[in-house]
């Protein structure tokens, strides 16, 4: 059986966010770097650093937390894996779902790389729906 790196990074980020951790350390691959760049660009995480340890590269993510009047920290990051190795989900450009009326994002793997739902609609291309983030 293969390892699902996308599910691993989603789980790591979700667990760190629920436990109010400030940073997350994940393994660096081309797919994880593309997804992290999208998260950084969309404002779901604050900072990304690339770290090398024993000839292995890691990404260290700094999570963004919002202060609330009642709670000291509010969990604002919700991630859900959609397409998985056992069941791939594909969509064309007209049927890409909108998350919370456009507030959330859908990350797709297309023939032109990994991108958000807005970019895929503008380029009029579909692809594999990797995950929802809101």
UniProtKB/Swiss-Prot annotation:
<keyword id="KW-0934">Plastid</keyword>
<keyword id="KW-0694">RNA-binding</keyword>
<dbReference type="GO" id="GO:0009507">
    <property type="term" value="C:chloroplast"/>
</dbReference>
<dbReference type="Pfam" id="PF00410">
    <property type="entry name" value="Ribosomal_S8"/>
</dbReference>
<comment type="similarity">
    <text>Belongs to the universal ribosomal protein uS8 family.</text>
</comment>
<keyword id="KW-0687">Ribonucleoprotein</keyword>
<keyword id="KW-0150">Chloroplast</keyword>
<keyword id="KW-0699">rRNA-binding</keyword>
<dbReference type="GO" id="GO:0019843">
    <property type="term" value="F:rRNA binding"/>
</dbReference>
<protein>
    <recommendedName>
        <fullName>Small ribosomal subunit protein uS8c</fullName>
    </recommendedName>
</protein>
<dbReference type="GO" id="GO:0003735">
    <property type="term" value="F:structural constituent of ribosome"/>
</dbReference>
<dbReference type="GO" id="GO:1990904">
    <property type="term" value="C:ribonucleoprotein complex"/>
</dbReference>
<comment type="subunit">
    <text>Part of the 30S ribosomal subunit.</text>
</comment>
<dbReference type="GO" id="GO:0006412">
    <property type="term" value="P:translation"/>
</dbReference>
<dbReference type="InterPro" id="IPR000630">
    <property type="entry name" value="Ribosomal_uS8"/>
</dbReference>
<comment type="function">
    <text>One of the primary rRNA binding proteins, it binds directly to 16S rRNA central domain where it helps coordinate assembly of the platform of the 30S subunit.</text>
</comment>
<dbReference type="InterPro" id="IPR047863">
    <property type="entry name" value="Ribosomal_uS8_CS"/>
</dbReference>
<keyword id="KW-0689">Ribosomal protein</keyword>
<dbReference type="GO" id="GO:0005840">
    <property type="term" value="C:ribosome"/>
</dbReference>
<dbReference type="InterPro" id="IPR035987">
    <property type="entry name" value="Ribosomal_uS8_sf"/>
</dbReference>
